[in-house]
Amino acid sequence: MNSRSLIRLLSMALALGALSGCASLSKSECLNANWEDIGVRDGANGQPEEYLIQHSTACAKVNVAPDRGAWLHGRDKGLERYCLPHRMYNIGEYGGAFDAGICRNFDQERLVDAYEKGRDVNRRANTLSEIDAELRDIRTKLENKELEKKERERLAYRLGQLEYERIDAERSLEHARRRARDL
């Protein structure tokens, strides 16, 4: 790496470090770094190539520069563990974001399909949770002995509607989970 590239990399690292607020590696990790192993870990966690800038910032404090080649080699190995359909499904199911660029050397169609199935499960589970919250709220209101008759009737009617909606939402969620089993 020439000095101009190193200066540019360090400048970006300092800017990113100032924004990020916390070090990606400790002083000890920098001083004893096996950059390939760190790359494997980062790849397995789906970190983008730009993440190396954070390591550069953290390690600059102890005058250590990352071995970019070793880190990239390790990251590629780690991505083999990250860029899998079941991982993308889990990211989608738990509401995470999918960055297709990170897994650009893998089967994008399968990964996006898995992610979308996970997102579908996430959306349906959220719908079910919202219905459950509204059901609890209505049941709590119906416990009020001073509730006016018209309001009690309105709430009781809505409670019945929600119970049917909940059955549909449960079926919908189970259907989405069954669709995802073939990953």
Regions found by a protein language model. Give the residues of each.
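Intrinsic-disorder/low-complexity detector
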Residues: 22-183
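Sec-dependent bacterial lipoprotein signal peptides
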Residues: 1-22
